[in-house]
Structures are given as C-alpha cells and as structure tokens.
Design a protein with these regions (language model features):
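Primarily EF-hand calcium-binding motifs
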Residues: 47-62, 85-110
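Ferredoxin-reductase
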Residues: 394-477, 547
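Cytosolic, low-complexity regulatory segments enriched in Ser/Pro/Gly with interspersed Lys/Arg
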Residues: 2-50, 54, 114-127, 156-160
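Membrane-embedded alpha-helical bundles of multi-pass integral membrane proteins
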Residues: 132-384
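Reductase modules of NAD(P)H-dependent flavoproteins
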Residues: 341, 432, 450, 455-459, ...
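Amphipathic regulatory helices of Ca2+-sensor modules
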Residues: 63-83, 107-113
C-alpha cells in the first residue's frame, strides 16, 4: 500500500467545520444555477488538493501518477464504487492536467485548505417574504384541506355503519326475544347488519377495472380518493373484524347461554316457535347450520386476515418457523380466494336464522349481490382481456441488482396514461400468479416496457429463467401475459403545473414513464415557447435515491434521452442520490467528489451514473429540498408523488403538512399503493 492512500484513509476520519459545511451542497439542488462550470472547476481543484494533501510525497514533494491512481482506486473502494483501471487512469490524467493548469507543477505545498462552498448560491438563504408567513392557517384547516376527500368518505362510511347498527338495534329492542336475551340480542343483530354492509363494500376497492374507468371522469376523480382504495379496503376489513367480535362474541358468550338456560315458561311464551317448540342446549345451537356456518366463516376469515398481515406478507422471515413455511405473498394471494367460500357460507348462514321468520328479514343477499356481480364480472373481463392481448417480447435485458427489463409489443387498442401499471403473468413459473409492475414506457411509444426487480419467489424465478435464456443466446424467451392497464397515483401528475417525483430504488419505475411522457410532450407541435409542456406542466423535479451504483444502469439510456430532449427548455430537473457514498464534505468522499465535479464540467457526464445527471452523495435533506421549492414557487400548488418504503412516505407526508402550515406554497402528497 502506497504512503499516499495510506495517509488518505488515516486522515479520512477527521473532520473540520468547514468541510462539514460543504455537505449542504446537494441538499437544495433545485436552486443551483446551471451555468456554474467555472465555479465547479475552481472548487474541484480545491477539493483535489485537499484530498491529495494528506498523501506523503517523495523528497522533492512530488506526487507520482501511481500515487494519485492508487488514491483514486482506494477512495472508490471506500465508497463502494465500481471503477475500472482504465477509468482510474483517465481520472488520474484529469487530475494531473488540472494541477498543471492551476500551478504548472504537481507540488501541493501552500495549497489553500478550502471547501466546495464556492458553489453555494446566496439564494439558499433568501427568507420567505413576511407577507406569506402571515398567511399561515391553523393545523386543522391545513389538515382538512389536504385530506378532505378521505375525511368525507370515512365519515359517510362511519355514519352508514352507525345508522344500520342503530336501526337494527332498535328493531330487536322491541322483539319478544329481548325478554330472554336482553341487550345482547340487539347488539349482536346490530353488528350483523354492519357486517352485511361491510362484506358488500369490501369488494369495491379491489375492482380495479371499475376504478380505472371511474378515474377518467374528472368530476368523480376530484371527490373520490381512488389512490386510497387499498387503505379503504383495509379499513372496511377492520370494520368486519369489529363486527365479527361483536356479533359472534355476543352470540357465543351471551345469547346462546341465555336461550339454553332460560325459564321454560318465558321461553315458551316468547321464542319457542322459532326453535320448533324445543328448548335447545348450547351445543345444539352451536352445531346447527347457523352455528357451524358462522364458525366456519370466522375460521376462514381469520386465516385470510393473518396471512394478509404485513409481517406475513412482507417479512415472513421474522415469523416463527412453523408459520414461516406458509407465509409470503403466495399465501396472501391464495388465502384471499377463501372468500369465495366465505360468501357462499354467508348466504347459507343468512337463510337459516332462528329469529327471522319472514324472507323479507333475510336481506344479506340484497347487500352483496351487486358488489359480487361487479367483482365476478371484473374477473371474467380480466381473463378474457388477458387472453386477447397478443404481446410478444421484443427484447429482454438483465441489470445489476437482479433487475429484468422487458420490452414488449403493444397490443392493439392498449391505451394508457403515464404512471399506470399492468399485471404480469409468466405461465412457465405459475399459471395463477399475477403481479403488478409499473409501465416504464410512455403512452406514445410503440412498445410496452416494464422493469422487474427480484424481491420474491416469483420474480426470482422469472429473472433466473430469462437470465439463463439470454446466457445461452436462446431466441425462444419465456412467454409472459399482461393484464391492464390500471390506474395509479402517479397518473394524477397531469393535474399539476409543478410536480416533485420521488423514487427509492425500483420505486423510480412509475416516474420513468412520466418523465418520458413529458419529454414526448415537449417534442409535440403546440408545445409553448414559455417553458411549458403540451399538457400544461411547467416544472418537474425528479429525485431518485438508490443504494448501489449499478442501479443507474436500469434507466441510463432513458435518462440520457430525457435530458437531451428537455435540452435548454429546463422543464425537467433530475437528481440522483447514491447512499453508499459518504456525504459531501466527508474526507472519505472528497476526492471522488472533486473528480466528479471536474469531469462533469469538462465533459457534461457524471462519472458515477454515466449520464448527464449529476449524482449527489448520501441521502437528500428533504426539509431543505422542500424549503427550496417553497421559496422558488411561492403561492403555487406542487404535486408530490412518492413510490418507495412506507417509512419515508410517512416522513414526506408529514413534511408536506408542515410546509403547508408554514409556507404559502401548497404541497399535495400522493403515494403509490399496489
């Protein structure tokens, strides 16, 4: 190991105040002037000298080319970057040219211990005008304005449940059976009425074709939060659980014991006719058709609910060994089909009620018939449509991180909006599994494309099959079927003039389609000359955060294309963040940062992503990013679209709420749900 990069690593764990300040350079890139080539070059010279100043030199205080190259290779390895020998040699020559241009020789004595703060624009510290600070509203108003569509739907649902419960409660409060069972009876029957209602509407949020069709209506889409369909499905499921506990629990612990132990005189005078004038025992009622169907429904729903829980579906490895064997996405998917049996049992259960003599009182079928017909119609439509789509694979490519890119023919009549997704099936892996993937092609493209990252059993099998076929140069690639398109949150970007698109890892896929669509709009005749796209979009900010350098290969060609087509119009701004690199200002990344800035200034290509989009280090400082947007777009409405893990999603949603309270700019948050 040379003395140069030995000293580099020995000094890499010491910090100065000035160096840490430079970490703010990438935190608010949206306000950086694009014409900063001279500043970059000057700052990169300082960064190179700071990084190399920690290296020992020979007696003449010279750095050799070998020393610099080894320092570059070590710094690259320290930051988990892939760097070839040829690239290291190129960057070494770049440094030598820069030093020779700056001083005429490679002596570094007397070099200023500066930082990269030359790049920091003064507008970062520009305060928000006082008149806008005075426009802050109360937290309640801001919350209501951001969530009013969710609020009214939830309120209407709660009102409907409460009204049905109260109506049935009061009805059975007047029955003769009340004398035997007391308030247990109306409580159980009130809960049963809410169960009928919730068992009906729980199907509607998963009728994806119907939702996609309704999204086309601006008036309907403006008042119904279709993006929250899965959340509402879960909310109604929670209502079903509460209803089961009240209905089943009250029957088993209160109603049935009171019937079995009722005074024979009171029993004969009140409800004997409902039981064939025979007072049943506890077990006789439990083992009756009504009892067994009810218990069977509870058991099946319990299995489905447990296998649909987040630990079971997303992280089965954290579960006990016995449960782990049956957990995962497949268990969730197949167990949900138990509800076919549940609905059959529900109808049977409702036809053998003890205390309901008239057919008019057996109303369960009235609640569920329309939702069940819609759902079954959707399933039939999906089967027919997927069989009619003749989509052939034109090209398949594998990327680092076990990502598979598929480019397919576009079926006739297949129309979609950017941000939508499709379900994909690979019959050679499973004839029954369909998985959702965002389209990464634009609506105007003559093909369809998707990117599949291996995150589960199905995707691993699909990746391995294609990887093996490509390795053997086999022209007979595995076949896939598609179903869709389906609406998603990202397609609502067209509602805004300014959008902020945030993707983590493979979560960038829906926004790649959006960016390509915007670039296509910029090319269309009718695109205005005042930096607007054809659909009225004025500005799109795209933030992509990933852990591995190889991830940039997934969309490298697309980002180059989008950057070139956007050109000088400046409608699209893209920012890549690589979290494996130490933050800017850290000595461990200073040499890489300096080379990156110098290479970008000379060639316009980022050395990390190999695209015209500069890569920033570590993670974005989201509060600074949002504050920068608020200052730049005072009084405007910004659509924030996010696809990635829930933890950051909650953080960004809270940040939007906070910014809406503290600034005059309104941030509207949208998150992808599959």
């Amino acid at each position: 190991m040379s003395a140069c990069y030995l000293h580099l690593v020995m000094s890499s764990y010491s910090y100065s105040v000035g160096e840490n300040e430079s970490a703010s350079l990438a935190e608010e890139p949206i306000l950086v002037n694009q014409n900063i080539t001279r500043s970059i070059s000057r700052s990169s010279s300082h960064g190179i000298r700071i990084a190399l100043d920690s290296c020992e030199r020979n007696s003449s205080s010279h750095l050799t080319e070998k020393d610099i190259k080894q320092a570059i290779m070590f710094s690259s390895s320290l930051n988990k970057l892939s760097l070839s020998q040829d690239e290291a040699t190129e960057y070494t020559h770049l440094i030598l040219e820069e030093i020779q241009t700056g001083q005429g020789l490679t002596k570094l004595s007397g070099t200023r211990k500066g930082t990269l703060n030359d790049l920091q624009p003064t507008c970062w510290s520009t305060p928000i005008p006082t008149k806008h600070i005075q426009c802050m509203t109360s937290a309640a108003i801001v919350f209501f304005r951001a969530h009013w569509r969710r609020i009214w739907v939830i309120v209407m649902w709660l009102v409907a449940c409460a009204a049905l419960f109260t109506w049935k409660f009061m009805q059975y409060r007047q029955r003769l059976a009340f004398e035997v069972m007391g308030y247990c009876l109306p409580t159980a029957k009130g809960a049963a009425e809410t169960l009928k209602f919730n068992m009906a509407i729980v199907l509607l949020p998963v009728c994806r074709n119907t939702i996609t069709w309704l999204r086309r209506s601006r008036s309907i889409n403006s008042v119904i939060p279709f993006n929250d369909n899965i959340n509402f499905h879960k909310l109604v499921a929670a209502g079903i659980v509460i209803g089961i506990i009240l209905h089943g629990g009250t029957h088993l612990s209160c109603d049935i014991p009171r019937i079995a132990m009722a005074d024979k005189t009171i029993f004969g005078r009140t409800i004997a006719g409902d039981f064939g004038y025979h007072q049943p025992s506890y077990m006789e009622i439990v083992t009756s058709i009504e009892g067994t169907t009810g218990i069977a429904m509870v058991v099946l729903m319990l299995i489905a609910f447990l296998l649909a829980s987040r630990p079971s579906r997303r992280n089965p490895g954290s579960l006990p060994p016995l449960v782990r064997q049956i957990a995962g996405f497949n268990a969730f998917w197949y167990s949900h089909h138990l509800f076919v049996v549940v609905y059959v049992l529900l109808i049977v259960h409702s036809m053998f009620l003890y205390l309901a003599k008239d057919v008019s009182e057996k109303t369960t079928w009235v609640y569920v018939v329309i939702p069940v017909m819609i759902y079954l119609g959707e399933r039939m439509f999906r089967i027919i449509r997927s069989m009619s789509y003749d989509s052939k694979i034109l090209d398949a490519t594998t990327y680092p991180g076990k990502v598979l890119s598929l480019r397919m023919t576009k079926p006739p009549g297949f129309r979609y909006q950017s941000g939508m997704y499709v379900f994909v099936q690979c019959p050679q892996v499973s004839k029954f599994e369909w998985h959702p993937f965002s389209l990464t092609s634009a609506p105007d493209d003559d093909h369809l494309s998707i990117h599949i990252r291996s995150l589960g059993d199905w995707s691993y099998h699909v990746y391995d099959m294609f990887h093996e076929a490509l390795r053997r140069s086999n022209l007979d690639l595995p076949k896939v079927s598609i179903d869709g398109p389906y609406g998603a949150a990202s397609q609502d970007h067209s509602k805004y003039e300014i959008v902020l698109l945030i993707g983590l890892g493979i979560g960038a896929t829906p926004f790649i389609s959006v960016l390509k669509d915007i670039a296509n709009d910029l090319d269309k005749e009718g695109c205005t000359t005042n930096h607007h796209s054809a659909n009225g979009l004025r500005k799109a900010y795209f933030y992509w955060v990933t852990r591995e350098q190889g991830s940039f290969e997934w969309f490298r060609d697309i980002m180059k294309e989008v950057s070139a087509r956007d050109g000088k119009q400046g409608v699209i701004e893209m920012y890549n963040y690589l979290t494996s690199i130490y933050q800017e200002g850290d000595k461990r990344s200073m040499l890489i940062s300096a080379i990156q800035a110098l290479h970008f200034a000379r060639h316009g290509i980022d050395i990390i992503s190999k695209t015209p989009v500069r890569t920033h280090f570590s993670r974005p400082n989201w509060p600074r990013v949002f504050h920068g947007l608020a200052r730049k777009h005072i009084g405007e409405r910004i659509g924030v679209f996010y696809c990635g893990p829930d933890d950051l999603g909650r953080q960004l949603e809270r940040l939007c709420h906070k910014m809406n309270m503290r600034t005059f700019t309104r941030f509207v948050f949208h998150k992808e749900h599959f």
